[in-house]
Amino acid sequence: MSLVYLLIAILVIMAMILLMSKRRALAKYAGYIALVAPVISSIYFLIQIPSVAKLQYLSTSIPWIKTLDINLDLRLDGLSLMFSLIISLIGIAVFFYATQYLSSRKDNLPRFYFYLTLFMFSMIGIVLSDNTILMYIFWELTSVSSFLLISYWYNNGDSQFGAMQSFMITVFGGLALLVGFIMLYIMTGTNNITEILGQADHIKNHGLFIPMIFMFLLGAFTKSAQFPFHIWLPRAMAAPTPVSAYLHSATMVKAGIFLLLRFTPLLGLSNMYVYIVTFVGLITMLFGSITALKQWDLKGILAYSTISQLGMIMAMVGIGGGYAQHQQDAIASIYVFVLFGALFHLMNHAIFKCALFMGVGILDHEAGSRDIRILSGMRQLFPKMNLVMTIAALSMAGVPFLNGFLSKEMFLDALTQTGQLSQFSLISMIAIVFVGVIASVFTFTYALYMVKEVFWTKYDSKVFTKKNIHEPWLFSLPSLILMVLVPVIFFVPNIFGKGIIVLALRAVSGGNHQIDQLAPHVSQWHGFNIPLLLTIIIILLGSVLAIKVDWKKVFTGKIRQISVSKSYEMVYRHFEKFATKRFKRVMQDRLNQYIIMTLGIFMIIIGYGYIRIGLPKVHQLHVSEFGALEIILAIVTVTIGISLIFIRQRLTMVILNGVIGFVVTLFFIAMKAPDLALTQLVVETITTILFIVSFSRLPNVPRSNANKKREIIKISVSLLMALIVVSLIFITQQTDGLSSISDFYLKADKLTGGKNIVNAILGDFRALDTLFEGLVLIITGLGIYTLLNYQDRRGQDERE
């Protein structure tokens, strides 16, 4: 099956979900219909593993805009296969989990699952794209679908603000990424990613190479919540928990990492890129791990832990990026080891973090709270979630016999080996190891502290008063399956390492097939060494800090803390107030004022053009022959136009305005343009009738008395506009001996199959204009339809 067919299948499922929204009896099954999408894609990508392992990459190319080299280029290699499997398999768990989480009585299920399937479609589109512009389109589509999912409970103020904040930051990064893609096109003349990576040596010597890297980093850091662009992720926790489990732990936040991995053969050629990504990742890891301890909301803890873990992966991507410069050197194996660790932890993080979010969702759903100050001794009420969250949290902390331990060991090993790499000095290595270890200590601390406070403290019935708690098996099933994978991967890591991660490494290395020999063999025991010693230190210090320190009291002092999020919110509110004031000053609900402003700006632009280039000399002027009929029609039009200024009755004004339109129809007839005359007649008739019918249903509010100053402004604008239009007509006739474009249209209209030049222009020569005019009418119609069918919906933020 072609990659295009897979995307079409997902779109068909989305259409089915949308249709179900019209039938309330079927709406409750929307989740199970949507579940088909990740199941189909999972089966498809699993089947492709043997082909990709044999280097039989699947690719599809459909021409789209050839002149700009924008095509529907899709390619399935090892890297896209790994990410597609994560998106699809985690998608199955999340979609099924959502069927138990959401209520068919209180939630609009078709709308939710349409948004969720749209997001999955967008993410798969990103990882399969082999064209930069196509990747950008899918990139922004993830931002749009994420906005819709975060604001799903739209009556909730936190949901609205979180959705807007995440949208603004990620779209800003997306626009920066688009600039980077355009720079790549300027440097290479192609938008095809495979071809671009093949010209890496040429690109690195171009003057736009460094600016392009900065644009890429902005796109990646905003999408993957790296400091200081991390602030949108905690706010996004206002979304339903299935959204947090899918978008904000396993998929969307990994898009920035995917981008850097995909372009590592190019970006890694710059040492600056290696430094920036490594240090931003470590700073983000440290900041996220410390800030997680300040949170009382379980989803807040997981949000900052996600930021921290993404920083850890990003740091490894940065260190390993140097492989692009040292593919043939003896130290190449170190870079490959680091990149392998990044991909391995990316997979592990998706599993244990998704399980943690699901556990928190069940606690919130059944206990009605996520506050660790209220939840205590929950192991008695939620034994299954106690098991799930404890194992997943310990895996995140890097405890032995769990998958997170293996990738955390690889991370620590990577830090200690940076001193052997040409990009880092001994001092740099010491700083990197220090920051990485401190961040890991705090990671262990918040992971252990979270499960201790929620499950292993004494149950207090005075604080937690809710009764009749239950823990449904179907609700718990997805998180239990993910929990089982955590120790399984620890005991058989090389099934995933050799079967999936090595295939991804081939793509990250730029197609170097010798990567198979350089890829590490993951072992549970690798002897007493520095990484193991660091792990023991981390576990001991983290345990002491988690057990002995009451972090609820540590961060409740009166010390004023600097918050990036609060700074953003302050700036956002300031600009919002500023914009509101200016908006009220300009938008005063007076249509004629809007028209005057619009025409005034137009006249200023034209006037500036006249000043810059000067008025052209009139050396030829073509005036059509006119007779008595044309003179009479012109006099009638001018007379009615002037009279409209002084008439105060609305109905009379509408009728006279219609008369002007009918006079224009007679002009077209006199000039032998029957098509235009018929069109003008129909439009004018319908418009006049609609105006009359509308006014007959509106209150009879007389037009205000004429204001001399206002009328003078109107007349002045009208006369100036008329003068400009006439002058533009004169200018178009001054050809200076050059051939007119009109001659081409007059001669080529027969080639289009049109009966006359007007039809040919509308249907062929300016077909895109006509198309978009039609789209404007369709959008207007949809807007009117929405207003007519609007019902005030409340209670969308309520959950069972």
Swiss-Prot record:
Membrane topology classification: Multi-pass membrane protein
Localization annotation: Cell membrane
Keyword rRNA processing assigned: no
InterPro entries, sorted: CPA3_Na-H_Antiporter_A (IPR050616), MrpA_C/MbhD (IPR025383), MrpA_C/MbhE (IPR046806), ND/Mrp_TM (IPR001750), Proton_antipo_N (IPR001516)
Keyword terms: Antiport, Cell membrane, Ion transport, Membrane, Transmembrane, Transmembrane helix, Transport
GO molecular function ontology, one term from the record: antiporter activity
Bridged cysteine pairs (disulfide): none
One GO term of the biological process aspect: monoatomic ion transport
Annotated transmembrane regions: 1-21, 33-53, 78-98, 118-138, 167-187, 207-227, 241-261, 273-293, 300-320, 331-351, 387-407, 424-444, 472-492, 527-547, 595-615, 627-647, 651-671, 676-696, 712-732, 768-788
The UniProt record lists the keyword Manganese: no
Gene Ontology cellular-component annotations: plasma membrane
Pfam families, sorted: MbhD (PF13244), MbhE (PF20501), Proton_antipo_M (PF00361), Proton_antipo_N (PF00662)
Family: Belongs to the CPA3 antiporters (TC 2.A.63) subunit A family.
Assembly and oligomerization: May form a heterooligomeric complex that consists of seven subunits: mnhA2, mnhB2, mnhC2, mnhD2, mnhE2, mnhF2 and mnhG2.
Protein name: Putative antiporter subunit mnhA2
Organism the protein comes from: Staphylococcus aureus (strain MSSA476)
